[in-house]
């Protein structure tokens, strides 16, 4: 695929050159074809956001995640999405952000505490053993879209890229996920797992799709409604009600 080849070239380039190339790339080289079509209406906003991160990176700011992973969530075909898990912005710790909400590289140790809490709740909910790694890509292969509301961050500065244009792109993305219809005109199967107030704020964009809402898994809030919320079994029950296959949430022992 041309897009995969183009993104591979970004991975091979030096840090700033990778970011510098992003604003001029065709949408089809940055994401799956159906995402390119769905986000064409916010292409100008997307290129503006990419130009912002390119300027930051070439100006010496350590931007996370890597250029090749900024739009990683959109490499997964839109047509395959059946669960949306919405995060806030990427982890600001260098080496953590990989372009998928809540996930880290399979080699990252220790894993972030929010992800540890997600594993703890998964064990309580489904009886699945926690993993020592934070690679969640096995979920994306089953139609779980791990999308952050904001797609970049400056290292060490959580929330630093809020209000820089990403929100328009992710608003369009959530709207596109919720707006899919089958041949009978019915909404395609979808469950949104919304952790925390920021995620919950997108609920009006979901077109009535079922949601699982709770506190955020952050150590600051997990004990105030995340633990015991059983998001994984509830999401699977809602998928079955829509005639969709449940997600196999168990992750490989090693990535």
Predicted feature locations:
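Intrinsic low-complexity, intrinsically disordered segments
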Residues: 24-28
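A charge-rich, low-complexity, intrinsically flexible signal that marks solvent-exposed coils, linkers
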Residues: 1-13
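N-terminal low-complexity, Pro/Thr/Ser-rich intrinsically disordered segments
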Residues: 14, 18-19
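A polyanion-binding, active-site-adjacent surface
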Residues: 29, 33-194, 198-206, 210-213, ...
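Short, charged low-complexity linear motifs
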Residues: 21-22, 88
């Amino acid at each position: 695929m041309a897009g995969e080849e183009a993104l591979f070239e970004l991975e091979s380039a030096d840090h700033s050159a990778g970011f510098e190339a992003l604003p001029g790339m065709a949408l089809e080289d940055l994401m799956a074809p159906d995402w390119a079509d769905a986000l064409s209406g916010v292409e100008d906003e997307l290129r503006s956001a990419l130009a912002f991160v390119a300027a930051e990176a070439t100006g010496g700011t350590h931007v996370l995640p890597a250029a090749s992973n900024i739009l990683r969530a959109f490499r997964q075909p839109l047509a395959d999405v059946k669960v949306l898990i919405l995060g806030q912005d990427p982890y600001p710790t260098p080496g953590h952000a990989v372009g998928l909400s809540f996930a880290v590289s399979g080699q990252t140790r220790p894993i972030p505490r929010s992800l540890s809490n997600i594993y703890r709740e998964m064990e309580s909910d489904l009886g699945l053993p926690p993993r020592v790694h934070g690679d969640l890509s096995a979920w994306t292969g089953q139609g779980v879209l791990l999308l952050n509301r904001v797609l970049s961050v400056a290292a060490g500065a959580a929330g630093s890229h809020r209000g820089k244009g990403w929100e328009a792109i992710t608003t369009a993305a959530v709207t596109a996920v919720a707006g899919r219809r089958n041949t009978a005109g019915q909404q395609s199967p979808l469950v949104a797992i919304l952790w925390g107030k920021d995620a919950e704020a997108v609920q009006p964009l979901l077109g009535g799709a079922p949601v699982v809402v709770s506190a955020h898994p952050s150590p600051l809030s997990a004990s105030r409604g995340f633990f015991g919320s059983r998001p994984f079994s509830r999401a699977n029950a809602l998928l079955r009600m829509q005639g969709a296959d449940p997600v196999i949430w168990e992750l490989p022992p090693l990535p």
